[in-house]
Amino acid sequence: MLDAFSKVITSADGKAAYVGGADLQALKKFVSEGNKRMDSVNAIVSNASCIVSDSVSGMVCENPSLIAPNGGVYTNRKMAACLRDAEIILRYVSYSLLSGDSSVLEDRCLNGLKETYASLGVPAAGNARTISIMKATVIGFITNNSQQKKLSTPAGDCSALASEVGGYFDKVSSALA
């Protein structure tokens, strides 16, 4: 995993150049937005169990056959696995948001996820819907538009962070498609 600083340094080192210009400005912006980034991650972490359970519940409410016999999350064991997997995905999205880099999400969470779910017979549509609900909920927390928040989110415009986290969820959706 390379954070924003490591990426810039690695790039400059590869060119045998000093860090400067646009790279330095990008790092200055990353640092100045740091408190918003940390507060946004804190909002996700503080509300993680609600985000995960509401996302999975929303998926089940929209498709009740999933909890019927032979459904994708029929047994307690399958439901627990579904909740666990959603929590893991949310955790890696929060790591990516904190570092400003999606490589940890891609390398440690998404690599082989689709194949694993396919081999277990997990329905792809349910996964996609859970991720979609989770994305909307997290963006609501970051932009301070959620009714359920336990903590306040940062003041000011967080639309760039909301867009960034939306991109991480889009990577998850693409990996599962």
From Swiss-Prot:
PTMs per UniProt: Contains three phycoerythrobilin chromophores and one 15,16-dihydrobiliverdin chromophore with binding of the phycoerythrobilin chromophores mediated by both the alpha and beta subunits.
Annotated positions binding (2R,3E)-phycoerythrobilin 1: 18
Membrane topology, from the record: Peripheral membrane protein
GO cellular component, one term: phycobilisome
Keyword list, A-Z: Bile pigment, Chloroplast, Chromophore, Electron transport, Membrane, Photosynthesis, Plastid, Thylakoid, Transport
Domain of life: Eukaryota
Subcellular location as annotated: Plastid, Chloroplast thylakoid membrane
One of the Pfam families matching this protein, by short name: Phycobilisome
Binding site for (2R,3E)-phycoerythrobilin 2: 28, 35, 39, 144, 154, 156, 158
Binding positions for (2R,3E)-phycoerythrobilin 3 per the UniProt entry: 82, 84-85
Family annotation (SUPFAM superfamilies): Globin-like
Family statement: Belongs to the phycobiliprotein family.
Function summary: Light-harvesting photosynthetic bile pigment-protein from the phycobiliprotein complex.
Protein name per Swiss-Prot or TrEMBL: Phycoerythrin beta subunit
